[in-house]
């Protein structure tokens, strides 16, 4: 299930929240959202997940279990503020090397400053680039991670193929993303929280509810767990699986390049 579609006029369209936009229009719109929330991104994730994103991210890093080797290289995509990369570096005993890639310079600036304050900048590289066109040679990384970012990519299938290309043989893909709630009653509560509470909290915290409204809508437009797993397989990955967190509010997807 690709996110890209042919419009009635023959052009390629994708979703920006509940709006249909041209494929080329989505990235600037997404960039504007994250320029607005960059300095409060972690607070935004707390609002979006009621703080559970921290538990989910820790579970993601536990699943990756990065070894304490200096030649272990991870590419963390859409990871501008460094939240995942920092966890990887610390879990490896400050041995692993993490490249943080984001298309948004504001997010990367926040991440680079945080890395300096933590004293781990030697283990990190910050790269401003597009997930659909990675500036790296094939077979460069041992792992590719992306947390709460893949749904913002205009052409998800292209980004997945790029992930496959830059991974080494035996490399692992891990995608953490909001997903489809699979627990009865929880889905109703989550819908009420998402559409009523999250934009209001967002406006209270940042003065602007529009970025939060988009993010809530983008979750609903993202493929469900099984459809997204099929997209990962279509990109060439093997041993594809997913694990639901908190009844399916989020899911961790895994695939291997073998």
From Swiss-Prot:
Record key words, sorted: Menaquinone biosynthesis, Methyltransferase, S-adenosyl-L-methionine, Transferase, Ubiquinone biosynthesis
Pfam family, one: Ubie_methyltran
Catalysed transformations (reactions): a 2-demethylmenaquinol + S-adenosyl-L-methionine = a menaquinol + S-adenosyl-L-homocysteine + H(+); a 2-methoxy-6-(all-trans-polyprenyl)benzene-1,4-diol + S-adenosyl-L-methionine = a 5-methoxy-2-methyl-3-(all-trans-polyprenyl)benzene-1,4-diol + S-adenosyl-L-homocysteine + H(+)
InterPro entries: SAM-dependent_MTases_sf, UbiE/COQ5_MeTrFase, UbiE/COQ5_MeTrFase_CS
Keyword S-adenosyl-L-methionine: yes
One term of GO molecular function: demethylmenaquinone methyltransferase activity
Domain of life: Bacteria
SUPFAM superfamilies, alphabetized: S-adenosyl-L-methionine-dependent methyltransferases (SSF53335)
GO biological process: aerobic respiration; menaquinone biosynthetic process; methylation
Residues binding S-adenosyl-L-methionine, per UniProt: 81, 102, 130-131
Presence of keyword S-adenosyl-L-methionine: yes
Protein's pathway: Quinol/quinone metabolism; menaquinone biosynthesis; menaquinol from 1,4-dihydroxy-2-naphthoate: step 2/2; Cofactor biosynthesis; ubiquinone biosynthesis
EC numbers for this chain: 2.1.1.163, 2.1.1.201
Family: Belongs to the class I-like SAM-binding methyltransferase superfamily. MenG/UbiE family.
NCBIfam families in alphabetical order: MenG_MenH_UbiE (TIGR01934), PRK00216.1-3 (NF001242), PRK00216.1-5 (NF001244)
UniProt function note: Methyltransferase required for the conversion of demethylmenaquinol (DMKH2) to menaquinol (MKH2) and the conversion of 2-polyprenyl-6-methoxy-1,4-benzoquinol (DDMQH2) to 2-polyprenyl-3-methyl-6-methoxy-1,4-benzoquinol (DMQH2).
Name listed for the protein in its UniProt record: Ubiquinone/menaquinone biosynthesis C-methyltransferase UbiE
Record lineage: Bacteria, Pseudomonadati, Pseudomonadota, Alphaproteobacteria, Hyphomicrobiales
